[in-house]
């Protein structure tokens, strides 16, 4: 691993010279320093790293607070150009945890049997062509994978095939469903055994309902097209405060047409043949309604807008809605963080909100006092140390649901990071 001292010295010199009078600074000096910083960056993105504690605000060259680096696998390990979404699977027989890492050219499988020395087991190649967009979810020991690649459809992969594997290989899908061409995302309700493909070429980009209770026989059973393109969604069997919908299967969609139509859509999808709109609502300074997640009591919805930081120049903003009355959601809190980076994907586990924050990496918040409109950042791990500006670099997605507490971060330029809360 490159020592952080080298990186920081170069960065300091670069910033110092930039603040000098331009007449006193030779252009070739700026170029030399910029090239040196780029060389350090190249080394970061091609070096396998093992356990590095977070000490004095850094784990190696990565800014951090409260999270140690367990391991880092750069893109060169996977022979890929960029990373995107990721997810996790724990083998119910062996207890071994696996990361499913989305890449431009496929999906990589990584065993965490020894977390400080993760083992790359190989790749399921993209069904057709490479794409910077790929999304993965898991149900019943199977991975379900979609992509924006033309004619990609849905790949289904039996994860139990990874048992006992110790060497890298190229895999083939168990099922290749070609009922649709492209899709941006997939969500799964594990309580009902239905997958929801969104942003596809069907139903005008709205959710497509797929029965996956028989893993090798996925079947489209319906869809919804009335509220424009759905970018992401969470689906639950509702157990929140609105008594009218207790026990119903509800979809919370983040919808955008990339122009003026940006809104959250709540659907009752209990009857797949006749989904019903409960409500659709927008919000101030909407730019691109990207992704949201419910608190575990289903009362609050944490929403990320992907373009508001760029379009309106604000600090990173998370909009929290009170869904006590599902037919009339209320803005509860518009939270601004300490960085200007763009929020991408966020997930809630118990009283913590985990966010993939692009150039600011992983950000973790205590939400135990959300009723009192309070959030507190309690930790972070910055996989993109160059800056925390509003740009599309850094952490695309994080997976915080492993029982071990290990969090998998997919960084667009730098591959897979495994981090864990620093022991107190």
Regions found by a protein language model. Name each.
Residues 16-19:
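C-terminal motif of bacterial Sec signal peptides marking the signal peptidase cleavage site
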